[in-house]
């Protein structure tokens, strides 16, 4: 089902964890994160999916919510572990940038709701350069930065300023052991050579202390195909091509957010 390319993987990742995937839209979970979800399913972790937008750009939000739930069930994720933001702060759109502080606050609320040990989402390029993906990356990065800062702050500093940001206040109660990872964006050639990107990944030099790589060895159809079929409103011809040609159907490289 999966292989590890990182032979020096932290032993803590082999222990059952509560893993939270933060995505922007329904179908992100299977288009991009299938190999990682497979890995954590394989080792018996409890998996949660938090979706900030229901993909309502053309009025299909409720349909797409149901599709995400069906896709997650297909991937072995409990329906009760699939969450949507209910604030309407995050509208789906290629020209919409989400507020970083709001994203951070929302991710934090999902972390507390799920008691997650690990949070996984997009990197700063968002795989497809989608601004909603990048907005999540910015919010998660800020959350982890503020968490790190809070560990070095003494209790006396809490009275130094009454105007401290929401970010710095809310991270004080965050589990200090939590880890966050971003899914690496690769160049367009590697993105669309599918399984052929595996040997290239092996050849590339990564920091094995902060990088994990997961591989799905299911080739035809790719393991992302079945859950993607649940997204009937989105499964048009070019997404068929993506599922079969994208390296993200077969391989995920995760980089720890320090």
UniProtKB/Swiss-Prot annotation:
InterPro entries from the UniProt entry: GlcNAc_PI_deacetylase-related, LmbE-like_dom_sf
Gene3D superfamilies assigned: LmbE-like
Ranges of Low complexity composition bias in the record: 148-170
Keyword DNA damage tagged: no
Superkingdom of the source species: Eukaryota
Region (Disordered): 147-170
Catalytic activity: a 6-(N-acetyl-alpha-D-glucosaminyl)-1-(1,2-diacyl-sn-glycero-3-phospho)-1D-myo-inositol + H2O = a 6-(alpha-D-glucosaminyl)-1-(1,2-diacyl-sn-glycero-3-phospho)-1D-myo-inositol + acetate
Annotated GO biological process: GPI anchor biosynthetic process
SUPFAM superfamilies referenced in this protein's UniProt entry, alphabetically: LmbE-like (SSF102588)
Function: Involved in the second step of GPI biosynthesis. De-N-acetylation of N-acetylglucosaminyl-phosphatidylinositol.
Protein name in UniProt: Probable N-acetylglucosaminyl-phosphatidylinositol de-N-acetylase
